Amino acid sequence: LIKSVINSKSQAQGNLIIERLAMTGCVGVRLDQMAILLEKLRKAAIGEPRWVAEKQAFEYQDRSAKVVAVLKLVRAAHGVSAIDLLCRAGLFVDFGALIRCINDSVSEIYFLLEEFPRTSGNVDQFIAEFFARTIDGHLSDDTPQVPTKKIRSAFVRVLSGSHDDQARKLLERIFRTFSGYIHASYSHIMEVYNGDTCDFNLRGVPSIVQRDMRMQHVDVAAISVLHAGAFIAQTLGLTEQHGEIMKLEDTSPTLS
């Protein structure tokens, strides 16, 4: 389904994909293989950053939508590796917070490359805000942020082929759900309380059943990141990388 949406962007299939990414972990993805392919894509798309001695940091000199999109993919893929470990350890609050970060990064990729190589005013503003947060300047950054609703709307348009209010509202609900983990909401904190032992499982929820249930979210996150990578490769005309990434979906039986 995701493969056909990336190629055709039909509205009906786009809606199914958004629901599938939200609710099911239907395809296993080997995270080590995914990491290799996404790093290969990164190297082909934007190359290596340059060492800036005076800042003691690596930086990309090309400040474009392409570079930001690929770096957002890097962040999302790193997050998938992290939630895999957190889920296995039963650390569900931080697990949920990172899922929100992954979802945001994936949405931003589609927003950035929706009209590539053209960029809208909102995309230009997003790029300026992104690069304003450099190693030496992040504390003084005053660049306004692009509203998140505009970013998620672009995500829906790319997958559905048009504006779809129902799909947008679904993404809004997902956003609000996982925002609770970041903002330490009451209900999300109470999820980890064990009434039998009268403690909050500060070293992780021990229940294997609970861990297995949440591992479905790792599947969903891995799939969404993998196909964001395929979208980048297709948009940039990297045919080899696009084919390799899409093939991984069909050849990987398990997640880890």
Which residues does each PLM region occupy?
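A cross-kingdom marker of C-terminal helix-rich interaction/assembly modules
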Residues: 1-105, 109-256
